[in-house]
Every structure is written in structure tokens, then in C-alpha cells.
Amino acid sequence: MSGDLVPATRNWSAAEVAGTGNDVDARYLRVSGEVELGNENERPHLTMSEPPSSKLDVLSLDLVVSTDGDSGFRMRWASFEWRHRTFPGAYAGVRVMWQGVEVASLQL
């Protein structure tokens, strides 16, 4: 990512999902999407926002792009997924931010 421009994003989804295997009783919140990146060494991920959302039923996440490895210009869509253990009905929605700008608002 270069500069402070808000990156293009697409294909957002958020859902509560059940655990698998020995974890079948667990519930997880899964958030996924894609972000347009311009360098081969850029990797997108989501982190919990600090401070959190002022609405207790809305989870606020930050879209972060880190760099790793050799640099090389190449425009591409990079997908990512974030999972967080939760309980049923903990959240009504998810808000995804990029440097203080909302890039997605998702209902559960």
C-alpha cells in the first residue's frame, strides 16, 4: 500500500459458524473479504480495533496490510479470513475500518 489512500475492497462476508472436530460446541465469528494490493510482498489481515466500537453489539475490526518478503509491483486482489471465538448472538454486526475510514459494514 502506498500513501494514505483507502484501498479498494470487495466480497465481504461475516457469519457465526460452529466449531468442528473436538470443538463442535464452540461458536466462531468468521469475517472474510478481499483487498486490492499493488505489491507482491503485501499481506492483508484483520485485527480488533482499539478502541473498540462504542456500540457493544458491533465488533469493530481494522484492516491492516503488512509487508513480508521481496518487493515487486503487481496489482492483485488478496483474500483474507479472520476467526474469533464468540457465543451465539454476541454481535449484531461487524464494522471494518482502514485508518479510521469505514470500508465495510456487515450485518450478522
What are these regions (language model features)?
Residues M1-L108:
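Exposed, flexible binding/inhibitory loops of compact, secreted disulfide-stabilized domains
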